[in-house]
């Protein structure tokens, strides 16, 4: 395949339609700077799919459209068409000629065509992928690309070999696979989160459903036997009721007779008991006074014994502390003396150290190298001066010889010599001006390059920092998004349970699901109470099933809803009509006393909130329940028997008013209605906060990306400006070098001509010149003699100084050893002093403490002495009072004994009458109770059949168990016990479990499919990595071999190698370059000179083209950094290489131009508009031959 032509219209400076036909061989494109040569290369890159605006030296894509000039208006479209000869079907299309067209309109629209057929940019990219002709391939080699090769890090340089290996397609496939893997993993994580949440629901629901089914089975059996029990009880009760009614009439008459006799005896007995009660009251008061006085006497005597024992203990402690104080004061005196001795010793040792340090410093100065260096420097100066005088001696000798020679020559060339000198001086002045101008330009450009390079480095560092921050922000966003998704899944599951009222009884659930039909229904208690987190469990336990009570406005509303449940056979529910419910509260005094008990947090009704209209409901439910922190405190309150209320702890234990204790734990304590509601609220709040954080992360991420994008544009602009500055600097340096070379030649010419003129004019003063020369030679000889004497003196001083220094060094070593010993003694003394000071301070503190304790004991003893006298007085007074009270009590007991005898006799008579009356009354009441009981049993059984089972007695008798009533009752007890053990069940859990299980199984299957897909993607990535590594290694070996061969050709010898920085990891290993140009050592590319690096980099690019030939290659001033000799080698290699590759070269170098077959010149005859002219150098070469 060959590049056949390029047609440009409206692209950058090519305003007019321009067509460039390319021939086989080497095509050169030349022209002055700014004429538009590089626009041709950019047009080729653009039409082949380049999308990076900065690579096209623009800020936006529409910058490639001709923007107008002084004489032309801007165009609205840029169009580039590139045509290939595809007769060898290099491109995978069935066309002998392939043309690719790209159009861009100023409104931003784009068109892409292949052989005039509309296509996508992706189609063009895919057509060129791995052909070596893509927008980023090595078919286009610029000076910047050459610099990138030798400036790149080894890890960046590996992309060159990857391009040769043709692994772009595989890496693109891997990138696509990685994206799919990330999506699959993300989706799998979300599915697993939902599965985990469903699994958490599934376990409790399965248990609830199982319990519900068991409950239904046992409930059916229970209802059947209960109906049979009611029918049998009703039949028996009717038969017994008839006999009881007859006995009841006889018993009533007998009760009236005995009651009259009892009433008369009761009046007399009441009078005696009144007297007895008064006497008993007086006795009790006297006994209480006597006991109180005895208690006072005993307490006072006991306290006297305790006080005596305390005084003895205090006196013993006082003696012990006094002895300890004396010992401590002795220790303080000893340690104070020791401290003084140590301070004196330390002062003496520090003085010795100071003296020895002064001696060491003095000897150190004496033995320093400064003196030796001063003598060496002086000797070196004398030698340099001696050598300078020797050079002067040689010059004087030459001058003398020249004087003789020039004196012998005479000439008539003075006039011609003067003209030549004037012309040379004029030329020198002109070149000097040019050199000054170029010097200034070079300094300015170097400063600009340095500043621009610093700016670029700073911008690149900021881009890297921003990229790291973007990665960190991206990771934080992903972590937050994943966490939020998991929380949302939990919230959705909880909301689904709440919306379906899954955890409510069937009847309650039916009412809540149809509440819109009943305007008076406020909701379930669990929905209407607001409970602080710390009390949730306590309130939930305290209310239990009452949380599912339904609050409504009136009894009529409750009746309407009850009828609704009956009609739909939807279960039962308990209703709390606001108009009828009365608040229940503890008495004010009881509530006040209860609040002061340890551990009491408050009455439950006052710790929760609700609407004001529901206050009575709240207090009805919780007004007599107190919340306590721990079970121990609750048990203590219950034992006091002062508070008749229900106690509930924070952990859910309860103590009833009767004293019954309930507690423990179940596996699903956190599934309560209130706890689920609070969990949903907390999760919703967390999700809202996470969403806010995500928005913040997204905004921060967008800001970072925008800032980095802007900064990247700035970096590219700076890099482009830097490249342009370097180009200008290279040109200026070349111009300066040429001017300096010319300046040097002209300076030499002026000096030579001036000297000739001076010699010609000096013939008249030949004798004077010879005399001066002889005088100068004599002075020179004297100076040489003087320098020789001074050098001998300095050398002797050096010898003496070495001997003196050796002696002083020995002394210095001895003094340093002594200093070290003294310093160690000082440290040891300081440690002893610090230890002594610490011990002394500790003893002082001990002394203060002992003194404080002694003072406290003395105060206590004085106080106790005063208390002894007071207690003696109290004891005497109490004993006297107790004797008087005891005498009064004995008198009262004698009077009470007489009354007791009278009461006893009359009571015996009254008891006998009462027994007779009571027996008659008991018979009557027993019969009456039997009547009431039997009537109640009949009514209750009839009502139960109607209310529970909606049956009449006749209908119930149609289906009765054949078991006897005791057997039925026993079985009912067993069934009731089973139902109680099951407890409250959620009948809706059966359907909910089936729904959750179905979704759980479905998602499990999905998770298995996703896991299998993930493993397949991982295997695909591993296969792609293997393919990339294999192709990379093969391409590397081939390029390395060609590189070594071509290096010898390009450098005319030497050797070079490509090496892998990490051969064990082919997927990440960098590529380093080692080179040894002729006459140099084997070293890294970065250590070579600039020209050697450039030529080595070009050699590597040629090696790449040799391994993977491309139909054509475009070189954009790739050889700009080479000298003339290397440019010739470069051009010659292109001639040898072009048999298989077509080359298009943009160049300024004459050596390159000479080897081109066709030259295109780019000019700007009209400002801002590029034109093309061409000439066939091959034809010219043939004509010249």
Curated annotation (Swiss-Prot):
The transmembrane segments are none
Q: Name one GO molecular function term.
A: ATP binding
Gene Ontology biological-process entries: chromosome condensation; chromosome segregation; DNA replication; sister chromatid cohesion
Task: Tell me the segments the record calls region Disordered.
Answer: 300-323
Write down the species. Lactiplantibacillus plantarum (strain ATCC BAA-793 / NCIMB 8826 / WCFS1)
What is the protein name for this chain? Chromosome partition protein Smc
Query: What top-level branch of life does the organism fall under?
Result: Bacteria
HAMAP family per UniProt: Smc_prok
Domain writeup = Contains large globular domains required for ATP hydrolysis at each terminus and a third globular domain forming a flexible SMC hinge near the middle of the molecule. These domains are separated by coiled-coil structures.
The family database entries (InterPro entries) matched by this protein are listed as:
P-loop_NTPase, RecF/RecN/SMC_N, SMC, SMC_hinge, SMC_hinge_sf, SMC_prok
Q: Which Pfam families match?
A: SMC_hinge, SMC_N
Give the chief site where it resides: cytoplasm
Domain SMC hinge spans what residues? 519-637
| Cellular component, GO annotation | chromosome; cytoplasm
- Provide the coiled-coil residue spans: 228-503, 675-928, 989-1025
Q: Which gene encodes it?
A: smc
């Amino acid at each position: 395949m060959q590049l056949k032509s390029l047609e440009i219209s409206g692209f950058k400076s090519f305003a007019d339609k321009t067509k460039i036909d390319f021939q086989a061989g080497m095509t050169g494109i030349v022209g002055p700077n700014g004429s538009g040569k590089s626009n041709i290369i950019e047009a080729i890159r653009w039409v082949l799919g380049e999308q990076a605006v900065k690579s096209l030296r623009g800020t936006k894509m529409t910058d490639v459209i001709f923007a107008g000039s002084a004489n032309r208006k801007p165009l609205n479209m840029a169009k580039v068409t590139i045509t290939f000869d595809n007769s060898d079907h290099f491109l995978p299309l069935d066309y002998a000629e392939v043309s690719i067209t790209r159009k861009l309109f100023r409104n931003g629209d784009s068109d892409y065509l292949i052989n005039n057929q509309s296509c996508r940019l992706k189609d063009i990219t895919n057509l060129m992928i791995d052909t070596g002709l893509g927008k980023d391939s090595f078919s286009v080699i610029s000076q910047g690309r050459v610099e990138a090769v030798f400036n790149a890090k080894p890890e960046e340089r590996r992309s060159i070999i990857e391009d040769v290996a043709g692994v772009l397609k595989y890496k693109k496939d891997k990138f696509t696979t990685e994206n799919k893997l990330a999506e699959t993993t993300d989706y799998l994580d979300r599915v697993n989160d939902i599965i985990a949440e469903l699994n958490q629901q599934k376990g409790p629901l399965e248990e609830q459903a199982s319990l519900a089914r068991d409950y239904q089975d046992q409930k059916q059996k229970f209802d059947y036997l209960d109906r049979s029990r009611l029918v049998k009880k009703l039949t028996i009760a009717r038969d017994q009721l008839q006999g009881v009614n007859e006995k009841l009439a006889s018993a009533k008459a007998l009760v009236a007779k005995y009651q009259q006799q009892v009433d008369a005896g009761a009046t007399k007995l009441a009078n005696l008991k009144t007297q007895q009660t008064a006497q008993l009251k007086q006795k009790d008061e006297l006994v209480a006074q006597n006991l109180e006085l005895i208690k006072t006497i005993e307490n006072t005597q006991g306290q006297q014994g305790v006080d005596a024992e305390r005084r003895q203990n205090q006196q013993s402690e006082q003696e012990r502390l006094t002895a300890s104080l004396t010992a401590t004061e002795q220790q303080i005196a000893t340690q104070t003396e020791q401290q003084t001795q140590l301070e004196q010793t330390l002062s003496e040792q520090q003085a010795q150290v100071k003296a020895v340090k002064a001696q060491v410093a003095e000897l150190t100065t004496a033995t320093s190298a400064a003196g030796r260096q001063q003598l060496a420097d002086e000797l070196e100066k004398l030698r340099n001066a001696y050598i300078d005088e020797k050079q002067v001696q040689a010059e004087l000798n030459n001058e003398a010889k020249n004087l003789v020679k020039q004196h012998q020559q005479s000439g008539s060339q003075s006039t011609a010599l003067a003209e030549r000198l004037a012309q040379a001086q004029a030329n020198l002045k002109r070149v000097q001006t040019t050199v000054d101008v170029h010097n200034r330009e070079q300094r300015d450009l170097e400063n600009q390059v340095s500043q621009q390079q610093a700016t670029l480095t700073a911008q690149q560092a900021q881009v890297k920092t921003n990229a790291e921050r973007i990665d960190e922000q991206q990771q934080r966003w992903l972590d937050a998004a994943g966490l939020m998704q998991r929380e949302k899944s939990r919230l959705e599951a909880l909301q689904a349970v709440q919306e379906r009222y899954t955890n409510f009884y069937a009847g309650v659930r039916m009412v809540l699901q149809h509440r819109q039909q009943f305007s008076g229904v406020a909701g379930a208690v669990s929905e209407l109470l607001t409970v602080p987190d710390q009390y949730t469990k306590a309130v939930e336990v305290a209310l239990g099933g009452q949380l599912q009570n339904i609050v409504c406005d009136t009894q009529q509303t409750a009746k309407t809803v009850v009828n609704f449940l009956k009609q739909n056979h939807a279960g039962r529910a308990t209703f709390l009509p606001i108009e009828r419910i009365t608040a229940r509260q503890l008495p004010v005094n009881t509530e006040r006393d209860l609040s002061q008990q340890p551990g009491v947090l408050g009455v439950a009704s006052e710790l929760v909130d609700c609407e004001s209209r529901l206050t009575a409901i709240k207090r009805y439910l919780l007004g007599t329940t107190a919340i306590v922190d721990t079970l121990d405190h609750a048990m203590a309150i219950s034992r006091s028997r002062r508070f008749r209320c229900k106690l509930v702890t924070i952990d859910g234990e309860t103590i009833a008013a009767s004293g019954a204790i309930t507690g423990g734990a179940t596996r699903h304590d956190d599934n309560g209605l209130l706890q689920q509601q609070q969990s949903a609220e907390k999760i919703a709040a967390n999700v809202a906060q996470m969403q806010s954080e995500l928005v913040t992360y997204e905004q921060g991420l967008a800001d970072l990306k925008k800032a980095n994008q802007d900064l990247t544009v700035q970096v590219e602009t700076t890099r482009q400006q830097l490249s342009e500055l370097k180009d200008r600097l290279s040109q200026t340096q070349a111009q300066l070098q040429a001017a300096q070379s010319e300046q040097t030649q002209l300076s030499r010419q002026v000096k030579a001509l001036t000297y000739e003129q001076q010699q010609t004019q000096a013939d008249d003063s030949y004798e004077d010149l010879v005399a001066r020369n002889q005088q100068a030679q004599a002075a020179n000889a004297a100076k040489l003699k003087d320098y020789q004497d001074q050098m001998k003196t300095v050398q002797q001083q050096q010898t003496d100084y070495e001997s003196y220094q050796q002696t002083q060094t020995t002394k210095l070593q001895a003094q340093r050893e002594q200093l070290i010993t003294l310093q160690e003694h000082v440290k040891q003394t300081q440690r002893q002093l610090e230890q002594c000071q610490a011990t002394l301070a500790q003893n002082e503190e001990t002394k203060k403490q002992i003194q404080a304790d002694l003072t406290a004991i003395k105060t206590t003893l004085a106080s106790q002495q005063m208390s002894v006298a007071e207690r003696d007085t109290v004891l005497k007074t109490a004993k006297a009072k107790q004797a008087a009270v005891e005498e009064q009590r004995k008198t009262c007991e004698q009077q009470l004994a007489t009354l007791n005898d009278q009461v006893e006799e009359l009571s015996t008579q009254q008891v006998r009458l009462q027994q007779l009356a009571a027996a008659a009354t008991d018979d009557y009441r027993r019969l009456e109770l039997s009547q009431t009981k039997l009537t109640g049993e009949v009514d209750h059984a009839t009502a139960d059949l109607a209310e529970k089972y909606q049956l009449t007695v006749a209908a119930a008798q149609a289906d009765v168990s054949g078991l006897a009533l005791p057997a039925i009752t026993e079985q009912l007890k067993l069934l009731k016990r089973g139902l109680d053990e099951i407890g409250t069940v959620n009948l809706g859990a059966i359907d909910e479990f089936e729904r959750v299980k179905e979704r759980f199984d479905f998602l499990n299957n999905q998770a298995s499919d996703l896991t299998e897909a993930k493993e397949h993607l991982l295997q695909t990535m591993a296969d792609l990595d293997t393919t990339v590594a294999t192709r990379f290694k093969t391409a590397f070996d081939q390029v390395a071999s060609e590189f070594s061969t071509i290096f010898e050709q390009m450098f005319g010898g030497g050797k070079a190698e490509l090496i892998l920085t990490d051969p064990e990891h082919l997927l990440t290993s960098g590529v380093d370059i080692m080179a040894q140009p002729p006459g140099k050592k084997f070293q890294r590319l970065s250590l070579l000179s600039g020209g050697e690096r450039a030529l080595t980099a070009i050699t590597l690019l040629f090696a790449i083209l040799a391994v993977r030939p491309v139909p054509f290659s475009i070189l954009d001033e790739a050889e700009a950094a080479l000298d003339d000799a290397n440019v010739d080698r470069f051009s010659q290699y292109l001639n040898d290489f072009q048999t298989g590759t077509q080359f298009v070269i943009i160049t300024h170098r004459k050596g390159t131009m000479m080897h081109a077959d066709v030259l295109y010149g780019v000019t700007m005859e009209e400002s801002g508009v590029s034109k093309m002219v061409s000439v066939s150098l091959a034809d010219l070469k043939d004509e010249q031959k």
